[in-house]
């Protein structure tokens, strides 16, 4: 049975999920959505969604920053907790992941690692390697994300 909220939403090729405190991951998500649309994909960008906001199949692209001691942004924490507690069946979800953080901390990109772990434990399959952007090396995180996206798009086409 398809939940009511699923039948009411439009289906995008790729759902971008951002977790951000200061807006950096949101900017990256919006930039990548534009690039994906230029490449012929339809997208939906959700900033800090709940589990019920997400399709239970298809392709997700997670973009999140890390704060404090490997902490998730406040707007992504509810989704992470839902994944951990509910363990939904995400066997029909494939995902890519981008983390933004500072190598000054030993928990560099800890937030993306936490969400990745939960997605995989729910059966989601990762496409490609996770991009971890060190903000000390990249003033504009959209730049390395765009380079990574080109490779990731090729993986989507061959998958």
Label every model-predicted segment.
Residues 37-52:
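A short, well-structured beta->alpha microelement
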Residues 7, 12-13, 18, 23-30, ...:
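FMN-binding flavodoxin-like domain, especially the glycine-rich phosphate-binding loop
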